[in-house]
Amino acid sequence: MIGRIAGTLLEKNPPHILVDCNGVGYEVDVPMSTFYNLPHTGEKVVLLTQLIVREDAHLLYGFLTPPERSTFRELLKITGVGARMALAVLSGMSVAELSQAVTLQDAARLTRVPGIGKKTAERLLLELKGKLGADLGPLAGAASPSDHATDILNALVALGYSEKEALAAIKNVPAGTGVSEGIKLSLKALSKA
């Protein structure tokens, strides 16, 4: 298995890149989130990789961060999700956005990714629940994102709201919001419903 590649970036043709490692050029497919953060051609690049061996090809997928690669691997475990769809998901949203969509069970957010319909989105939400890691929680950018969402959710449930109502209200909480402010915003959203 090829787990990491370090070399000179020779070509960039979305979503493919070519990396020269000691005279050998590796074609690597990358999600757009990685592609946009690559250095200029001719510069050094280091990618974490996932090698997929098929009957007719050996395909190499590259990522700049460990969470991107681990999320890609989790997506591949889902029935009906291949490497292309997993790459499309990571190209259409960040790992933090995907984690937030899973935590909030936001199928509408996933259906905005090209190639993901309602049924596929629901299957992704169901099978990814609890698998993306605590460090990739729902409120992207917050100091401890998963703790904030969990605390807000628990507070709303303790106040008598159903988990479904609480999850719908948490969707209105912007990234980086603290627990007390998140509870206030969620309660405002619930009072309007």
UniProtKB/Swiss-Prot annotation:
GO biological process: DNA recombination; DNA repair
Region (Domain II): 65-139
Residues covered by region (Flexible linker): 139-143
Residue span of region Domain III: 144-193
Gene Ontology CC annotations of this record: cytoplasm; Holliday junction helicase complex; Holliday junction resolvase complex
Keyword Cytoplasm: yes
Keywords attached to this entry: Cytoplasm, DNA damage, DNA recombination, DNA repair, DNA-binding
Subcellular localization(s) per the UniProt record: Cytoplasm
Cysteines joined through disulfide linkages: none
Stretches for region Domain I: 1-64
CDD domains on file: UBA_RuvA_C
Keyword Cell membrane on entry: no
Gene Ontology molecular function: ATP binding; four-way junction DNA binding; four-way junction helicase activity
A Pfam cross-reference name: RuvA_C
Recorded superkingdom: Bacteria
Functional description taken from the UniProt entry: The RuvA-RuvB-RuvC complex processes Holliday junction (HJ) DNA during genetic recombination and DNA repair, while the RuvA-RuvB complex plays an important role in the rescue of blocked DNA replication forks via replication fork reversal (RFR). RuvA specifically binds to HJ cruciform DNA, conferring on it an open structure. The RuvB hexamer acts as an ATP-dependent pump, pulling dsDNA into and through the RuvAB complex. HJ branch migration allows RuvC to scan DNA until it finds its consensus sequence, where it cleaves and resolves the cruciform DNA.
This protein's domain notes: Has three domains with a flexible linker between the domains II and III and assumes an 'L' shape. Domain III is highly mobile and contacts RuvB.
Protein name (database record): Holliday junction branch migration complex subunit RuvA
Record organism: Burkholderia mallei (strain ATCC 23344)
